[in-house]
Regions:
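Contiguous beta-strand/loop segments that form the cofactor/metal-binding neighborhood of enzyme cores
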Residues: 1-52, 56-169
Length: 169
């Protein structure tokens, strides 16, 4: 799941900085008016530059789940969503999207929305794996295992945070 990241702003067109090459940035995609959202981070809010949150963030969590569970590639994928809540925003990527990745023995569900409150504030971007021995919650910063019996186990992703402390946001 993932919550937020899609910009809700509606800034007016602006003159790009002198160092910004709009042709190079846009490539073969349709040209959009430059705004404060174009660069550096909010470009993810536009289909012309990205594939939305599912193409930007889901791929990382899905790969993590596939790796942990040794799933291989999904056999089928279905998805639904759209711009259902933040209709006034300049962004044109979905503010709500759910997808089902069907594997041989199980389905992996992805859900994101860029509005509201995350159901689990400790894991606004992460994965939850429910198993017969307990539940594993994980993100790029931490993980928690909550066994059916016994005490929970928690760990932070210390190597990356020691090596790159600026990643802790």
């Amino acid at each position: 799941c993932y919550y937020h990241m899609r910009s809700q702003k509606t800034p007016p067109p602006a003159t790009p900085p002198s160092w910004f090459d709009s042709e190079m940035w846009t490539g073969p995609s349709p040209m959009r008016p430059y705004t404060e959202l174009t660069h550096p981070r909010s470009w993810r809010s536009f289909m012309e530059y990205s594939k939305g949150i599912i193409g930007d963030m889901c791929v990382h969590m899905l790969d993590t789940v596939r790796w942990i569970l040794e799933l291989g590639w999904p056999k089928r994928i279905s998805s639904s969503g759209g711009i259902l809540v933040q209709t006034e925003a300049l962004a044109n990527t979905p503010d709500t999207q759910n997808a089902t990745f069907a594997f041989d023995d199980l389905n992996v569900l992805w859900s994101h929305r860029s509005w509201g409150t995350a159901p689990d504030p400790e894991y606004p971007w992460g994965a939850t794996i429910y198993g017969d021995k307990g539940t594993l919650k994980l993100s790029v910063h931490r993980w928690d295992f909550i066994p059916r019996q016994g005490d929970p186990v928690h760990a932070d992703v210390t190597f990356e945070l020691d090596e790159y402390p600026e990643d802790k946001t």
